[in-house]
């Protein structure tokens, strides 16, 4: 029984390793997705370049250049500037599982489908999420959905709708540009 669980954990980790490798080798990507939480859903996209990202969803845009995070809530006409913790970045970037599954989680195989593997990550004490369920396309190795359960049992479901590989981004793509939003108040919380 213990041996079967060890093999299952190795298979789950191999699937995530392959998915992470495939996504990284895709170069800079733009992923369109639907985010579902209690009370509603929202479509958005994320542009990724290494650890840098810009996330646009539901009236909020978040830029992260690897050090500084800017979060613009359009309705408030305000952008908050922070130096986020690793956990804060993980919560904002739904594809951060590409690195965090290696520490703080126990991986196992879930119930997959004919087209997708299902990997279940169970958070160890102190992990940002209690449970993360990731579906990975068997032929492309790209993630197709991610279901995250917080320590307080709040669920977030992300479905990948599109993925564009080898995008070209300028460094400024991942930084807030005040000229683009001249009427927005900048609140520096660093």
Regions found by a protein language model. Give the residues of each.
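Generic structural signal for beta-strand residues in well-ordered domains
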Residues: 2, 22-24, 46, 62
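Intrinsically disordered terminal and processing segments
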Residues: 11-13, 49, 162
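One face of beta-strands
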Residues: 27-35, 42-46, 51-55, 130
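An acidic-aromatic
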Residues: 43-92, 151, 156-157
């Amino acid at each position: 029984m213990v041996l079967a669980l060890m093999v299952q954990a190795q298979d789950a980790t191999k699937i995530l390793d392959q998915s992470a490798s495939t996504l990284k080798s895709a170069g800079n990507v733009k992923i369109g997705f639907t985010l579902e939480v209690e009370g509603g859903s929202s479509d958005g996209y994320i542009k990724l370049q290494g650890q840098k990202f810009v996330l646009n969803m539901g009236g909020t845009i978040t830029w992260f250049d690897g050090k500084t995070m800017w979060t613009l809530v359009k309705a408030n006409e305000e952008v908050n500037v922070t130096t986020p913790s690793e956990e804060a970045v993980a919560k904002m970037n739904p594809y951060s599982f590409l690195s965090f599954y290696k520490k703080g989680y126990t991986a196992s195989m879930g119930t997959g489908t004919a087209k997708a593997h299902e990997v279940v990550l169970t958070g160890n004490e102190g992990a940002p999420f209690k449970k993360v369920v990731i579906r990975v396309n068997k032929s492309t190795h790209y993630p197709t959905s991610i279901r995250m359960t917080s320590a307080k049992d709040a669920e977030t479901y992300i479905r990948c709708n599109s993925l564009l590989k080898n995008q070209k981004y300028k460094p400024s793509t991942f930084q807030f540009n005040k000229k683009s939003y001249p009427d927005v108040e900048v609140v520096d919380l660093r």
